[in-house]
Amino acid sequence: MNGFSFTVLSYPSQQLWSLNKITSLTTPSWRELIEVARWAPTIHNLQPHQVKIISDNEAELFYNPERLLPVEDPESIFTTIALGVFIEHLSIAAGPFGYKVIIDRIHNPVSTQSTKTTLFATLRLISTLEKEEINKSLIFERRTSRTDYNGESLNKNTIQRMEKEARKFGHDFFYSENKEIVDFVIKLNEETLFEDLTSKPTRDELDKLFRYSKKEAKNYKDGLWTKCMGFSGALTKSIFKNYKRWTKGFRKKLLKKYYMSTFKGTSTICWFAGQFNNSEDWIKCGRMFARNWLIMTDENAYIHPFGSLITNVNANNKIVSRLTNPDNSKKIWMIFRAGYSKIPIRSFRLSTNQIIIKV
């Protein structure tokens, strides 16, 4: 299936101007970095990351097993990718201070069998002469757009920047504007979504993650707020609570027609391929993906990831046989549509205090 002081948290758009003016090379605090990085995207907005501050330049990254997906992500591959995204956001946030965040050690793979908050990696904050090219203000602007796009193809400059960034991590970036390919991917995504919904364990897992009203979304500050998904809360709740009613007849046709209408104007499909064998690979995927998503944000473009086309075996086999990937040693691990739309709704995030583990 398919993160600053309180003032910044409350009014991020009013604070962006100040973020570019940091010139001091004093060491930033971990709290400062987390206040920015908490806006990083995570799978289903679960935000499994927690941080224990050890010293000014060392922190431990933990994951909360209650924020994993035993059904949809049993090996926690995409959770690990999300941890990589979070780490890169920490590093980008440190850039204006003349610092970056590196991984000192990965301790153990993320496991759905864990029963307590578990140590994943040790992080270090180090000074660097390298200039961070990505402006951290983009972290607050980034969104996922699941609505209709305006029909424009992804800008060539954006594509060139993404190709260059992917290569830095040993990954390949591909895209297609071929209508046949675009239609194939969108249709396959729709078929896979409805196939996944036939699984009761999948439906039950998702039902716990959906926030069917703004009140729920604001209270939990995590999960899938239906407004961000482009569906009404009442409709989505009906689908998950009364699933059989939506499996046949006019309701099924109506649901599919409505879902497909949200893909109008899609003209570019993109995908990444790279090494995808272990935690180190998945973290690298996340760090690269984080940077490229922010590059697209800098170019005023949005994306909508199609996670189910990777996690669903049948769909993935069709993707592998259809999409370009000349290097057999690399795996297509991320597919998404990219383009231009109205500014999407921002989902909520856990507070910095909820992420930091008190010692």
Cite the ranges covered by each PLM segment.
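Acidic, surface-exposed loops and disordered segments
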Residues: 1-359
